[in-house]
Amino acid sequence: MKDTTSLFITDSLDSLNPKKDTSILMMEEISNQEGKVFQCEMKDLRYFEQIVQANIVEIKDPISTPRVFTPIDQSLPLKDFNYVFMRKDPPVDDDFMNALHLLSQAELEGANVINRPAALQKFNEKILALRFSAWMPDTKVICKEDDLKNFKDRHSTIILKPLNGMGGELIYKFEELTSKNFEIFKSLTNNFQTMVMVQNFLPEIYEGDYRVLIIHGEPFPIALARFPQGDSFKANLAAGGKGQSREINSVQRKVGKEVGKLLMQEGVVFAGIDMIGDYLTEINITSPTGAREILVQSKQNPIQQLLQSL
């Protein structure tokens, strides 16, 4: 990455935790390799003078808090950077989609955008996993109350989650369908209009929810196993779970390779799959995380491998 320029489109800099954030680790690695690092938010993108541009800052010291940055006096074309990393966290709302449309235009102008905007536009992360339904727990995408009842009749405990959530937000476990739980379902579906996902609950979650990073189509050999704490059933780090680095097993490797084939076809060079036991639950392609924790605990660096593959 020496003598290269990289632009990161992220959430606000002050919201990124240097000790945990994968985007900061990516900036750090590029900076260590004598590349130049720049950053902007989605709101800084614009189409002006017949080209996609961004108002940016240069990141001088990615790991410092607060991070040392220098504003750039002019708006620069995205095509002038060697790499443009789209690293904005969900939700995938209208602003997110409009930014992707601009990034697709920037691609046409010559920008090298990672991951490809077309793939981020095309796939919902939870629905994308349905392409590998043979590896998934029993899963339905529904919005009607009768479908919820029918699904609950098949399983003693079920999980309900929105299609555009992240970090364990708005995920519920139903052991029975109480009036309160019906109200939760009604709320999440916007009065039975918006699709949600239901799955049978996997008790293997207490043995770890594994984040397996997929880099250039190949599973990284070390995963981050996340464990629920206390009475919680949520293993996401953002929801209070604790992570441990673990070597991936043969099933995780097999699923990772299968998913990796599709991702490479779609221009997704960096992704994360989530697996509970032998089951695939999600494919994260927007801004996969977990790399910092893997590096700190195992001393193996997935981001170094990613940058070498570009």
Spans of model-derived segments:
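ATP-dependent carboxylate activation and anion-phosphoryl transfer catalytic cores
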Residues: T4, T10, L16-K19, Q244-L310
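Redox-cofactor binding/interface segments in oxidoreductases and associated redox assembly factors
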Residues: F8, F85-M86, Q199
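Short glycine-rich anion-binding loops that position phosphate/pyrophosphate groups of nucleotides
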Residues: S12, K88-P91, L163-G165, P288
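Conserved N-proximal alpha/beta basic substrate-recognition cap immediately N-terminal to
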Residues: D14-V141
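Short glycine-enriched loops at secondary-structure junctions
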Residues: P117-Q121, R226-P228, I276-Y279
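Rossmann-like NAD(P)H-binding beta-loop-alpha module
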Residues: A134-S156
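Phosphate-binding site of ATP-dependent enzymes
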Residues: D146, H155-S156, E169-R253, L263
